[in-house]
From Swiss-Prot:
Domain of life where this protein originates: Bacteria
NCBIfam families registered for this protein in UniProt: ATP_synt_b, PRK07352.1
Native organism taxonomy: Bacteria, Bacillati, Cyanobacteriota, Cyanophyceae, Oscillatoriophycideae
GO cellular component, as recorded: plasma membrane-derived thylakoid membrane; proton-transporting ATP synthase complex
Membrane-topology annotation of the record: Single-pass membrane protein
Keyword Cytoplasm: no
Molecular functions per Gene Ontology: proton-transporting ATP synthase activity, rotational mechanism
Quaternary organization: F-type ATPases have 2 components, F(1) - the catalytic core - and F(0) - the membrane proton channel. F(1) has five subunits: alpha(3), beta(3), gamma(1), delta(1), epsilon(1). F(0) has four main subunits: a(1), b(1), b'(1) and c(10-14). The alpha and beta chains form an alternating ring which encloses part of the gamma chain. F(1) is attached to F(0) by a central stalk formed by the gamma and epsilon chains, while a peripheral stalk is formed by the delta, b and b' chains.
Record organism: Picosynechococcus sp. (strain ATCC 27264 / PCC 7002 / PR-6) (Agmenellum quadruplicatum)
Gene: atpF1
Family designation: Belongs to the ATPase B chain family.
Segments crossing the lipid bilayer: 26-48
HAMAP family with a match to the protein in the record: ATP_synth_b_bprime
Name listed for the protein in its UniProt record: ATP synthase subunit b 1
UniProtKB keywords: ATP synthesis, CF(0), Hydrogen ion transport, Ion transport, Membrane, Thylakoid, Transmembrane, Transmembrane helix, Transport
Amino acid sequence: MGIISYLATASEGGFHLNFDILETNIINLAIIIGVLYVYGSKFIGNILETRKSKIVADLEDAENRAKKAQEALTKAQKDLEQAQAQAAKIREDAKVAAEKTKQDILAKGRDEVEKLKASAVKELSTEQAKVITELKRRVAELALAKVEAQLRSDLDESAQAKLVDRSIAQLGGGA
């Protein structure tokens, strides 16, 4: 009935307040709001507390993950620095080893060259000695051939007999 009177007064062109407590259901509304406040506040409080706990747990979890990520990043950076230092050391060791190997190879090469030179000089000396010996033999043969030819032309049989007898006497075979 309150709505009808409201519409009736609104149709008459005025606005007025209805102060009849029973007609406006203020008591019913107060009871419902009170019940909702008493029981709803506990329910909503529990929901809000649960939500708050979940948010706090999520924040703590996020902070823990961020802390772990930071620790992992720090460890990875340290590992990277160590790896870079080790790589630099390996590079330096490789340079030293390469230089040592180079010097060893050069030394071996010089030794081989010296051996080859010595071998060549020795072979040359040997060949030179062979050639000199061959020349001496050839000169001796030519000289003997010339002496024989001259002896045949200059010596007759009596001179040859005297020469043979004298040679035998010199050798100690003469009586």
